[in-house]
Amino acid sequence: MILGTGVDIVAVERVARAVERHGDRFLRRVFTPGELAYCTSSEAHRAARLAARFAAKEAVLKALGIGLREVRWTDAEVCRDERGRPSVRLTGRLAEIAAARGATRIHLSLSHTQEYAVAQVVIEG
């Protein structure tokens, strides 16, 4: 059974400006060390990769029907399997909320261009 869906689109330039303005403070507040390692491994795709992960975190919140005030950005981590397929790992308060709502599986799709990043999340339970 589908418990929720969420979609988010982010302008890549918006995330790039946030990084320029706030630097490491922004990066550490929003992204996990694993996400940062992957995103910064390619300077050419850095901003688009960060924007896609930002969109994924927003899409997870929308799918669960909650706001950011209840959780931390880093409670949702975008991971990749051996074939590069993205997935979401929940921790902390966000994992507790998802479990309380009966979430058993989270599907994630990401896409980005130089201008925009989009994420779609479907939560099953």
UniProtKB/Swiss-Prot annotation:
GO terms for molecular function: holo-[acyl-carrier-protein] synthase activity; magnesium ion binding. Pfam families: ACPS. Mg(2+) binds at residues 8, 58. The keyword Cytoplasm applies. Its main location: cytoplasm. InterPro entries: 4-PPantetheinyl_Trfase_dom, 4-PPantetheinyl_Trfase_dom_sf, ACPS, Ppantetheine-prot_Trfase_dom. Gene3D superfamilies: 4'-phosphopantetheinyl transferase domain (3.90.470.20). One of its GO terms (cellular component) is cytoplasm. The keyword Lipid metabolism applies. It comes from the Bacteria. It is an enzyme of class 2 (transferase). Its cofactor is Mg(2+). GO terms for biological process: fatty acid biosynthetic process. It is found in: Cytoplasm. Its EC number is 2.7.8.7. Keywords: Cytoplasm, Fatty acid biosynthesis, Fatty acid metabolism, Lipid biosynthesis, Lipid metabolism, Magnesium, Metal-binding, Transferase. It catalyses: apo-[ACP] + CoA = holo-[ACP] + adenosine 3',5'-bisphosphate + H(+). Transfers the 4'-phosphopantetheine moiety from coenzyme A to a Ser of acyl-carrier-protein. HAMAP family: AcpS. Belongs to the P-Pant transferase superfamily. AcpS family. NCBIfam families: acpS, pantethn_trn, PRK00070.3-2, PRK14660.1. This is Holo-[acyl-carrier-protein] synthase. It comes from Symbiobacterium thermophilum (strain DSM 24528 / JCM 14929 / IAM 14863 / T). The gene is acpS.
